[in-house]
Amino acid sequence: MDMKNFPGHSPVPAFETQQMGFPNLGEILVSAGRLDARAVERVTARQKERGIPFGAAAVELGLVSQADVHAALSRQFDYPVLAAGDQGADPELVAAFEPDSPRVEALRKLRSQLVLRRMARPTQKTVAVVGTSRGEGRSWLAANLAVVFSQLGERTLLVDGDLRFPRQQSLFRMGPAGGLVARLAERSDIGMVPAHARFARLSVLQAGIVPPNPQELLARPTFAAQLAAAREEFDMTLVDTPADDIGADAQLVAAACGSALVVARRHETAHKRLSVLSASLREAGVTVIGGVLLDF
């Protein structure tokens, strides 16, 4: 992932502390069923003997894995991540499963840039993620960007505005019941649901069942009203969109959002088509706040 001119952002420090009200690491491991009281005594003794952190002592004794310690540290610092093998989300959510990877560090840099721009223009808190063609990575970027915003402590909403080929309900392992389609068709008020038990600050409004009239539904005033309500309730709202070459859906969504982030894939996205998309968005009054070039 190549993101230009995005300032750096440091990840959560990997250390242990009982200061500032953080919970005890041993208590977290006990509550997770990884240690019992006797094991804690053994770890504490090894910790004092070797002068090493509690987690390192527990791993050294073979009582827990490094992954167990990492998960406990994440809970200790209120930094939600998922353990490998968690069936509640798709592994493509690298921001949840691989928070220390280079790709996720790049996502944090992008998040920092968006936060800075929002500070200058507070209205830019509802952003459509758009692109020219299918397979460029819009859904992946929208989902993982939503995760890193929630990890920052922001109340985050991810809306699947791709009513033709919705992916968010698959990435977050949700059923198709309810969702945006049902709300736009005024058939149900069931909508936003928590993305995962570990991500209390992230809600997802999945698309729902694929309708025969996606563009007409998105053009209804109800959609703009849904986004207006989200602006009041959430710190950041990200909206996934269909590919622009399928129809006018993406531009309708972006116009309702007011801001758009344009996604391209290296060696696949044609520069001319990208320029045409950006120009058409600006003509529709959409603020193009940046571009992301994915290279994986």
Regions found by a protein language model. Give the residues of each.
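Solvent-exposed alpha-helical segments within well-ordered globular domains of core cellular machineries
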Residues: E27, E41-A45, A56, A71, ...
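Short flexible coil/turn linkers enriched for glycine and charged/polar residues
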Residues: F22-P23, R50-I52, A120-T123, R198-A200
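Short boundary/hinge segments that flank catalytic cores
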Residues: F15, H70-L141, G161-L163, E268, ...
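Conserved catalytic-core segment of NTP-binding enzymes
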Residues: V181, Q215-F296
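Conserved NTP-handling cores and scaffolds of large molecular machines
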Residues: G33-D36, Q47, G51, G62-S65, ...
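P-loop/Walker-type NTP enzyme "switch/lid" segment
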Residues: G85-S112, M119-A120, V130-R134, E154, ...
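A conserved segment at the C-terminal end of the G1
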Residues: S139-G161
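Non-catalytic accessory regions
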Residues: M1-G88
